[in-house]
């Protein structure tokens, strides 16, 4: 009886959040993807999810083949949703292979039963959505002006609006997912993942909303923020100051980092070590933090695909009684 009462309470809270965010359910269009696609499991697409915070974008929801509406599922939210499942549909012919990795790990009973929510990026706004806003606000005037000038050159309205992007996920998308599908809603069953700038926003999400996200995976984290690794680039150090002030408790949160050694990833090593120092200072240990180097790996989806099983297992490891 208590379980039913809690579910009813949660249902009405979620509906209220959707109502408050002005996201009417009848304005959301969904459909199953073509079953002939090379996908392990099934994908339902939400076409241009409406939002008062960000530009509408597609959202792909992956379900395991044996999905059962009578069960409840953990949820993994992932950035760059159009790059996750099908290399035939991506701009560079690469993919993360999320469906294959999830299916294999679930079949081997290595993961909690989980659905994956792939949030597409809007390319022209990707940097603005993914760059941590409080980090930007803490930069000195010279750096902020330079970054805003960079955005204007690309015809972007602003360099950063990631606080609104997280509001979209937390107050619009997640409530919709939770009232539409049989999900477990606690932080311990809600994880977030991304790569490069998508790693930055995933890390920012667990810091800003520790009551929502219990775990984050950050692959090839773009610590330098832009494409400049000059000594005058203060972004990495402002990020670490932010982490020192805002990392969630390691008692009930865990964070995964990794990086390669080739192409853009070759720039990350010194900053990754600083991040590890920050987490260790905040009492993160081997149970709550991972930081892995993958020799020879480049900054690309095909390499994140190669190592994806590792962060998935860290975030979603099945609990054995």
What are these regions (language model features)?
Residues 1-8:
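Bacterial N-terminal signal peptides that target proteins for export
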